[in-house]
UniProtKB/Swiss-Prot annotation:
Main EC class the enzyme belongs to: lyase
Organism superkingdom: Bacteria
EC number: 4.1.1.75
Known cofactor(s): thiamine diphosphate
InterPro entries the record matches: DHS-like_NAD/FAD-binding_dom (IPR029035), THDP-binding (IPR029061), Thiamin_PyroP_enz_cen_dom (IPR012000), Thiamin_PyroP_enz_TPP-bd_dom (IPR012001), TPP-bd_CS (IPR000399), TPP_enz (IPR045229), TPP_enzyme_TPP-bd (IPR011766)
Family: Belongs to the TPP enzyme family.
Catalytic activity of the protein: 5-guanidino-2-oxopentanoate + H(+) = 4-guanidinobutanal + CO2
Organism: Pseudomonas aeruginosa (strain ATCC 15692 / DSM 22644 / CIP 104116 / JCM 14847 / LMG 12228 / 1C / PRS 101 / PAO1)
UniProt entry tagged with the keyword Lipid biosynthesis: no
GO process annotations (BP): arginine catabolic process to succinate; isoleucine biosynthetic process; L-valine biosynthetic process
CC cofactor note: Binds 1 thiamine pyrophosphate per subunit.
Lineage of origin: Bacteria, Pseudomonadati, Pseudomonadota, Gammaproteobacteria, Pseudomonadales
Protein name: Probable 2-ketoarginine decarboxylase AruI
Length: 559
C-alpha cells in the first residue's frame, strides 16, 4: 500500500454500529459542517488542531480546498495546548476540532489553562443527535450535558440546534476574542445538525467589528492628574497589554516609572531598557521595590497570586487600573481610578493628558539596576544553578526565538530571571498551572509563527504527560524546534515541598524511560550534554538545523 493510500486508510473511522464508513461521493448540497469550515476560513482561520473521529466527519468533509491546514495531534489535550501556543504567539484565536464526549473531556484541561491565562481558543465539537440529548440512551460518546462540562472554563459554551445558529455563534465568539477579555469558547454541534443541508449558504457571513474603546474623559483626567502628581510612580503590565508596548515604553520614560510585568507580559520592554524591572514581583527584591511606590498603574493584569507567589502585593500607595474586564477593578486591590478600555488606546489617551516633558529617570534607573543585582544575589543554590543554565540559553537563543515552558523548576526561575526580548516570546501555563503544556504549546507556537525558532523547556515529569506529541512535531515541523528536557529524575518541586513540610517523600521519584531512545523513536535528533559548555554548543546546533532536536540535560551534568 502506498503512502497516500495508507493515509487515506487511516482517515477512515468506524460508525457506532461498527459498520465501515466508506468515502462519500461528491455532493451538490452544502452541509452545515462544510459551511462552518468555509466560514472559519473567511474569518481568517488558517490552522485547526484535532483528531478526526466518526462524529466529526462532516467537519472534515469541508477541509479539503478550504485553505485551512489540519494538524493531526496524538491526543485532544495536545490539540488544545497547541491551539493555545498558536494563539499566544500569533495573536489569533487557536481552533480545535474534537469529538463528542471523550474528545471534550480530553481537551478540557487545555481549555481551563487558556481560560485562566486569557487565551482565545475556539473549540468546536460534535455532540450526539439532537433527539438523544439528555435522554441517557447509551449512545456512543454520550454525556449527560456536554455544554455544562465546559461552561465554567469558557467565556461561553453553546449548543447549536440548527445550521442557521452557527454563523451567529461564531460571530459571538469573535466578539469575545476582539472586544472582551479573550477566553475560550466551546460550540457543540449535534450530528444531525452537522450533516444537515444548509437552506442558504452563510459561509461568507463574517461579522467582525472589534469595539474595545477608551474610558470616559473624566476618568482619564483623574488618572492623569494622579500620575502627574506622583513622586515614585511604578507600572505593572500583563498579558492584556501585549499590544501596548510602545505606549507603555513612552509612559515609563515620561514618568520615570519602573515597569514590572506579569509572566504573560514578559518582553514588553527590551531587556536592556533602564526602567525594565521584569517579572520580578514574585521574589522579595521585587516586593520590596513595589512597596516604595506612591502610585501604581496596573495595565491588563489581574494581579493574581500565581504571578506574585504571595497572596497580596505590599502596595502602600494608590492604584490605578486599566483593564477590559471591570470585575478586576476591585479584586483584592481597590482602584483609586478604574479605566475600562483597550490598553493601547487608553495609555495613548493618558499620554496626551500628561506633561510632555520627561522626568529625570536616573534615580529610578539606578533603583532598577539595584533590583536586578539583588535578584541574582538572592538566588538559593538551586536557583543559581538554574540561572547558569538560563544564561547559556540566552547566549545561544536566536534573536527572534520564543520559549515555551512547562511547570518545571527551571521555568519557575526563568519566569523572573530570564529576560525576554519581545512580547509573545515566553509562554508559560501560569494561572491553571497544568503539567504537560510546554511541548504541545511549543509545537502550536511554531505553526503560528513558523519563521521563529522555538525552544521548549520541560521537566522529566511534565514531559511524559504529552511526550507523544513529538510524533506531531516530527511530522509537521521542518524548521528548528529545540526541546530542552531538564531531567532530575524526580517530581522535584513536590519532593522539595514534602521535605520542607517534614513529609517523607512519596510518589515523587519515578523510574524514567530512556529519553534519548524515546526521542530517536519519534524521529528527533538527540543530544545529551555533559556540562554547560556542551549545552550551549548543542543549543546552537539545534537552532541551526531543521526539525526537532531533543536535548536531555541531567541535573548532575549542569554543575
Amino acid at each position: 500500500m502506498g503512502a497516500r493510500a495508507l493515509r487515506r486508510e487511516r482517515r477512515l473511522r468506524w460508525s457506532p454500529n461498527w459498520t465501515r464508513i466508506l468515502p462519500m461521493q461528491p455532493q451538490k448540497t452544502l452541509t452545515a459542517g462544510q459551511a462552518l469550515v468555509r466560514l472559519l476560513a473567511n474569518y481568517g482561520v488558517d490552522t485547526v488542531f484535532g483528531i478526526p473521529g466518526v462524529h466529526t466527519l462532516e467537519l472534515y468533509r469541508g477541509l479539503p480546498g478550504s485553505g485551512i491546514r489540519h494538524v493531526l495531534t496524538r491526543h485532544e489535550q495536545g490539540a488544545g495546548f497547541m491551539a493555545d501556543g498558536y494563539a499566544r504567539v500569533s495573536g489569533k484565536p487557536g481552533v480545535c476540532f474534537v469529538i463528542t464526549g471523550p474528545g471534550v473531556t480530553n481537551v478540557a484541561t487545555a481549555i481551563g489553562q487558556a481560560y485562566a491565562d486569557s487565551v482565545p481558543l475556539l473549540v468546536i465539537s460534535s455532540v450526539n443527535h439532537s433527539a438523544s440529548l439528555g435522554k441517557g440512551w447509551g449512545c456512543l460518546h454520550e454525556t449527560q450535558d456536554q455544554r455544562a462540562m465546559t461552561a465554567p472554563i469558557t467565556a461561553f459554551s453553546a449548543l447549536a440546534l440548527s445550521p442557521e445558529q452557527l454563523p451567529e455563534l461564531i460571530a459571538r465568539a469573535y466578539a469575545v476574542f476582539d472586544s472582551e477579555r479573550p477566553r475560550p469558547v466551546h460550540i457543540s454541534i449535534p450530528l444531525d445538525v452537522l450533516a444537515a443541508p444548509v437552506a442558504h449558504d452563510w459561509s461568507a457571513a463574517v461579522a467582525r467589528r472589534p469595539g474595545r474603546g477608551v474610558p470616559c474623559s473624566e476618568a482619564l483626567r483623574a488618572a492623569a492628574e494622579r500620575l502627574a502628581a506622583a513622586r515614585r510612580p511604578m507600572l505593572i503590565a500583563g498579558g492584556g497589554a501585549l499590544a501596548a508596548g510602545e505606549a507603555l515604553a513612552a509612559l515609563s520614560e515620561r514618568l520615570a516609572a519602573p515597569l514590572f510585568t506579569s509572566v504573560a507580559g514578559k518582553g514588553l520592554l527590551p531587556p536592556d531598557a533602564p526602567l525594565n524591572a521584569g517579572a520580578s514581583l514574585c521574589v522579595a527584591p521585587g516586593w520590596e521595590m513595589i512597596a516604595e511606590a506612591d502610585l501604581v498603574l496596573a495595565v491588563g493584569t489581574e494581579m493574581a497570586d500565581t504571578d506574585f507567589w504571595r497572596e497580596r502585593l505590599p502596595l502602600s500607595g494608590e492604584l490605578i487600573r486599566v483593564d477590559i474586564d471591570p470585575r478586576k477593578f476591585n479584586d483584592f486591590y481597590p482602584s483609586a481610578v478604574a479605566l475600562r478600555g483597550d490598553a493601547r488606546q487608553t495609555l495613548e489617551a493618558l499620554l496626551v493628558r500628561l506633561p510632555q516633558e520627561a522626568r529625570d529617570s536616573a534615580p529610578a534607573a539606578a533603583r532598577v539596576a539595584r533590583l536586578r543585582a539583588e535578584i541574582r544575589a538572592a538566588h538559593a543554590p538551586l536557583q543559581a544553578l538554574h540561572q547558569a543554565i538560563l544564561d547559556r540559553i540566552a547566549a545561544a537563543l536566536p534573536a527572534d526565538a520564543f520559549v515555551s515552558t512547562d511547570m518545571t523548576q527551571l521555568a519557575y526561575t526563568g519566569n523572573y530571571a530570564f529576560a525576554s526580548r519581545a512580547p509573545r516570546s515566553w509562554l508559560h501555563p501560569t494561572g491553571y498551572g497544568t503539567l504537560g503544556y510546554g511541548l504541545p504549546a511549543g509545537i502550536g507556537a511554531k505553526l503560528g509563527a513558523p519563521q521563529r525558532p522555538g525552544l521548549v523547556l520541560v521537566g522529566d515529569g511534565g514531559f511524559l504527560y504529552t511526550a507523544q506529541e513529538l510524533a506531531t512535531a516530527s511530522e509537521e515541523l521542518d524548521s528548528p524546534l529545540v526541546v530542552l528536557l531538564w531531567n532530575n529524575d524526580a517530581l522535584g518541586q513536590i519532593r522539595d515541598d514534602m521535605l520542607g513540610l517534614d513529609i517523607e517523600p512519596v510518589g515523587v521519584l519515578p523510574r524514567n524511560p530512556d529519553f534519548a531512545l524515546l526521542g530517536r523513536a519519534y524521529g528527533c535528533a538527540v543530544r545529551q550534554p555533559q556540562d554547560l559548555d556542551e549545552l550551549e554548543r548543542d543549543l546552537r546546533a539545534g537552532f541551526g538545523q531543521s526539525g526537532v532536536t531533543l536535548i536531555e540535560l541531567r541535573h548532575a551534568c549542569a554543575r
